[in-house]
Regions:
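Domain-level signature for soluble enzymes in the chorismate/prephenate branch of the shikimate pathway
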Residues: 1-276
Length: 276
């Protein structure tokens, strides 16, 4: 049975490239304009699952994804995948590279390709776009001289790649998560990750230490922790945490039980296999 996926679009983004790694050939892949729209499509039942980026090894967390998971109608992560982020410089077929005066791309891509741009096109105007795929689409219409994005975008918009792997960090990787409506967690594999949004009742000295101690007490390792503003008032934060292990593992279950005693609220964001 085919699955209907939402993903951060438009077509030709790194998110689509990541989704193609895990989706079946008969699955339906539907592009949405932003992370919020993709996740709302799951909430509304328009799709069964969504794939969205959650962190990048160079740029850090994707704040919109973290905030959407921590608030609104609950959703859970059921899988994750990673994708090496390799940027390409592309132009129209008849464009001479020497004539490039404007380069369009997403701000994150620009920040990861600054050395290449400074060395090869120091006088080019860099134009920000909503996504790398949007830059490629605009280029196909003649809006810019060149675009920086994923190689998959060049195929979509019939563009010529004139330089590949132009990122300053050749080991850049983005982690993506599959998100669904709450249900039964995937079966424990022995190499899992449990994600949580943890809310403290009163922001006080040692609050984070109390949370960390619960995991340390039960020898549960944390692979990710990020504070995010609650939006209620200045200085109030909650924490997004990734713990190694499955919610059905005794150490993780014990740590969660301890957190419930000291935290105002805990939102379970899923237990799922770690990406290979």
């Amino acid at each position: 049975m085919s699955i209907k996926y939402a993903y951060l679009g438009p077509a030709g983004t790194f998110t689509e490239a990541a989704l193609l790694k895990i989706a079946a050939s008969d699955d339906q892949l539907i592009a949405y304009a932003n992370v919020t729209a993709a996740l709302d499509a799951v909430r509304k039942g328009e799709v069964s699952k969504a794939l969205v980026p959650i962190e990048n090894s160079v740029e850090g967390v994707v704040a919109r994804t973290l905030d959407e998971l921590a608030s609104g109608e609950p959703l859970v992560i059921t899988a994750e995948t990673t994708l090496p982020v390799t940027f390409s410089l592309m132009t129209l077929e008849n464009k001479d590279p020497k004539d490039i005066k404007s380069i369009a791309t997403h701000p994150h891509a620009e920040s990861q390709c600054r050395s290449f741009i400074a060395k090869n096109y120091p006088n080019a105007q860099v134009i920000e776009t909503a996504s790398t795929a949007a830059a490629a689409k605009g280029l196909s219409k003649g809006d810019y001289d060149a675009a920086i994005g994923a190689a998959i975008a060049a195929k979509y918009y019939q563009l010529k790649i004139i330089a590949g792997d132009i990122g300053d960090n050749t080991n850049a990787v983005t982690r993506f998560v599959v998100v669904e409506k709450p249900g039964k967690s995937p079966v424990a594999t022995g190499k899992d990750r449990t994600s949580l949004a943890v809310f403290i009742a009163i922001d006080h000295a040692g609050a984070l230490l109390e949370i960390l101690n619960e995991f340390a007490k039960h020898q549960v390792n944390l692979s990710f922790i990020q504070s995010r503003p609650t939006g209620s008032q200045l200085g109030h934060y909650h924490f997004i945490i990734d713990a190694e292990g499955h919610v059905e593992d005794k150490p993780v279950a014990a740590a969660l039980a301890g957190l419930k005693e000291i935290c105002e609220d805990i939102r379970f964001l899923g237990s799922y296999p770690q990406a290979k």
